[in-house]
Structures are given as structure tokens and as C-alpha cells.
Amino acid sequence: TEMYSNTGGQASKASNIGEVCQFAAAGKEISKKSLAEICMTYGYIYVAQIALGANMAQAVKAIAEAEAYPGPSIIIGYAPCELHGVKGGMTNCQNEMKKAVEAGYWNLFTFNPALKAEGKNPFTLTSKAGKMDKYQEFLANETRYSRLSRAFPDRAKALFEKNQEAAEARYTHLTKLVDPVSYTHLTL
């Protein structure tokens, strides 16, 4: 959920730039950590980043691969919650997942270390490049972001641009991992 949602919605290292939550009433200023990439650096953990509402087939395949993998696995899913404040309510949850992926806010991928034994790249990027013209619209659809626009419009504009730039850089980085030469740094 990109925050500590089980204790009331406090900012965490998983909170994104410009997100308004407890302890970040003026919008979080720094990028979120990438738990998926942290896990990939170990080289022996199966890692998947999914969003059921965006790509059910990728999610189901990742879950099956994670279960079959003979070592530790982690699946990180984009899961809107009430604290996100999705416009139209939680009945729009599946559609919000799709919007997150289409805009480039959330990327779908897997890292399957078992593929290395077959001489294959363990990293698979399922997401296409985000439709960056939809990015700000996506942020505005969740009150965890839109609240900042109402309270501090200039700050919101700057932080949301920074958020989008981070998303573009993240996707560029992920595309480099598709190259077999680039992924070698993922193993210790």
C-alpha cells in the first residue's frame, strides 16, 4: 500500500514522492525504496512485482512460479486501499491497478534465479513504457496525492514532476536489466 496502512497510514520508506500521509502532511520528498530490487541483489530469491487488475495472466504465472521455486520467494503487488482514496471508492480498485501500470507508476516484472542455471536472464520485464501523458492524471485520481494539490499547489506540482521523473528513471533502469550483460550485477 506504500505506507503503514495497518497502523493508520503513516509514511514509510515505501511511500512515494508527493504522497500525503501521517508524518508527511506536506508530501513526502524522497523516492521510495525498491523492495523488489533489494531482494534481487541477493541473487537467489524469486521476486515478482504484480498487479492483478492490470495483468491477471502475469500475476497468476508469477504466483505459480514463486510457489514452485525451491527457495525464498516474494511477490509485491500493487494493492490500492482505502487510505489511497481512489476516486469512486474501492469498487474501482481493479481499474486503478490497470491505470497504475498503464501510466508507468507501477511496473510488472519477475526475477527467477532458476533461469540462470539454464543460461537465461532471470529478469523478465512485462510492463511496456508508461503513458507519461497519463501519469499526472493517475496521481490526481488518488486523494493521497490530490490533497497536496489543494493545500500546496506549487509544491504539489514540483513533487509530482519529481515523482514522474523517478518513474521514468525506474523504467529505464528496469529495461537495462533485460540485457544479459546488465543483470550480472544482481548476484553477489
PLM segments and residue spans:
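Thiamine diphosphate
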Residues: 1-73, 80-82, 86-100
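Generic preference for well-ordered secondary structure
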Residues: 19, 23, 31, 46-47, ...
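Glycine/aspartate-rich loop-and-adjacent alpha/beta segment that forms the canonical ThDP
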Residues: 59-155, 162, 175
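A short structural micro-motif
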Residues: 165-169
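Short, amphipathic C-terminal "tail helix"
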Residues: 171-182
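Conserved small/polar residues in nucleotide/adenosyl-binding loops
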Residues: 184-188
